[in-house]
Amino acid sequence: MASQPPPPPKPWESRRIPGAGPGPGSGPGPTYQSADLGPTLLTRPGQPTLTRVPPPILPRPSQQTGSNNVNTFRPAYSSFSSGYGAYGNSFYGSYSPYSYGYNGLGFNRLRVDDLPPSRFVQQAEESSRGAFQSIESIVHAFASVSMMMDATFSAVYNSFRAVLDVANHFSRLKIHFTKVFSAFALVRTIRYLYRRLQWMMGLRRGSENEDLWAESEGTVACLSAEDQATNSAKSWPIFLFFAVILGGPYLIWKLLSTHNDEVTDNTNWASGEDDHVVARAEYDFVAVSDEEISFRAGDMLNLALKEQQPKVRGWLLASLDGQTTGLIPANYVKILGKRRGRKTIESSTMLKQQQSFTNPTLIKGVTTTNPLDEQEAAFESVFVETNKVSSAPDSTGKNGDKQDL
């Protein structure tokens, strides 16, 4: 009887560990290994290695603003295109003094490829935003007054022209009637005889030539008086025009210079001169544009106060070296607290010294209070929205983790 072939291996026999020999009492045999068991499964026991994954970055400022909000102070003035041709007439023509438009002032600073602007361009626009908004409001106010005066002037002017048209029609009617009556020789003869009769009876003195000379003298006197009044009335618009031309640029320059001084004072928080907020970087961040700054985990950053923070969701205005400012993701740093600036400390020290010199007896009983808690409470509202959208639980600061600086 022929021997039967050996049965196929069982599942538990095919999942032997590589290198293990056959069971005791059995001869050498093949070693089976499963396909799903690789050499990497056998690791040495020990502490597992954990890597901190940085939280996701919220949309960048250039993606949030886009091309709709970058022109907040670059509107296109195209509202002045009015003409008053409806009030005109065939005899004097229509009056349309204002027909213009400022369509060249509105443009988009983003290029076609939607690259974010440089840090210099953004800083220049942010520094001049308030000044241009003030100028824009002034321009709109003058534009509204100009449109009102334009409408009033057009209404008065066209009413005056309508009255002149009526007077002109009456004068034409008089001329036509005069021509009709003067066409008759009989009327002229009767008129001549009537005047001669008046001269003969003494009812009319002088001759006809003297009457004509007297009438011409009165006409010349009236014309000279009207010319003097016209020349005097034409002088004040010239002075007003030059006042606007010279005074407008001066006012704009004063507004820009004043706003630039305020912007320079508002950037002292980066160097620590003014009050600022201190934060510690929890993750590494690499900037992808000039409006951002790079930092590494463990770096100490100075953050701007709540009033100076840009209205960008999930991003904060910060400085690493005290000179360069840029945006950083809010969920990559941990807020430590608010620190008083050097100017504030010096001014408070000088004030205390002056008070101690002037009234030393009252200073002994005064208990000094630490304003750090109040300052921190005022600044917590800046990061409320950031803490909600942050995915990492340790990426934002809590009240218990803040340190007194």
UniProtKB/Swiss-Prot annotation:
One of its GO terms (cellular component) is peroxisomal membrane. InterPro entries: Peroxin-13_N (IPR007223), Pex13 (IPR035463), SH3-like_dom_sf (IPR036028), SH3_domain (IPR001452). One of its GO terms (molecular function) is peroxisome targeting sequence binding. CDD domains: SH3_PEX13_eumet. It is a multi-pass membrane protein. Residues 147-235 are annotated as: Targeting to peroxisomes. The keyword Transmembrane helix applies. Keywords: Membrane, Peroxisome, Phosphoprotein, Protein transport, SH3 domain, Translocation, Transmembrane, Transmembrane helix, Transport. Interacts (via SH3 domain) with PEX14 (via SH3-binding motif); forming the PEX13-PEX14 docking complex. Interacts with PEX19. This is Peroxisomal membrane protein PEX13. It comes from Mus musculus. The gene is Pex13.
